[in-house]
Amino acid sequence: MQKTPKKLTALFHQKSTATCSGANYSGANYSGSKCFRFHRLALLACVALLDCIVALPAYAYDGRVTFQGEILSDGTCKIETDSQNRTVTLPTVGKANLSHAGQTAAPVPFSITLKECNADDAMKANLLFKGGDNTTGQSYLSNKAGNGKATNVGIQIVKADGIGTPIKVDGTEANSEKAPDTGKAQNGTVIQPRFGYFGSLLRHR
């Protein structure tokens, strides 16, 4: 008898933070006098394809993870086209691959890239991660699929730093992500700030 496949859905809000002319955004306090504006950013991560609504064999997880939010940056900064709207596809994963707490499976790389930033603006770029109603210090996106959802399974985002440092998605300023080293300024601009990550399934308990 074939079992009903479990569902996996999580919501992730992403926003960078900065201060503009005394105005405070998202509780952050960064130095600088230039005004900032929002750029919309949306990513979609699917476990298997078929429009993200799939009927998988027994012992497999299915569903989708929606990444959405905004990047707040100075007027000189722009978001690379391929970072604005994207689908990050996670492969089908068998239950045996997530059999115990702390186990991860199916890591998929993705990045968020800015362009045309001057040196000062690039150094101020920060990303603040928040996933739905995640609690303080939580380092995975909770499953919001509803009835029939996979239990104890979420989505983890880690840095592409060679170590796989988990990103905390509680939306606190202390856990915001600073732009990596952007290189030397060239003709008023810098090498594109690029935030690199991996998204994967996580058995959290």
From Swiss-Prot:
Protein name: Minor fimbrial subunit HifD
Topological category with respect to the lipid bilayer: Lipid-anchor
S-diacylglycerol cysteine lipid modification positions: C20
Family assignment from sequence similarity: Belongs to the fimbrial protein family.
Lineage: Bacteria, Pseudomonadati, Pseudomonadota, Gammaproteobacteria, Pasteurellales
SS bonds (residue pairs): none
SUPFAM superfamilies: Bacterial adhesins
Organism encoding this protein: Haemophilus influenzae
Signal sequence region: 1-19
Lipidation (N-palmitoyl cysteine): C20
Compartments in which it is found: Cell membrane; Fimbrium
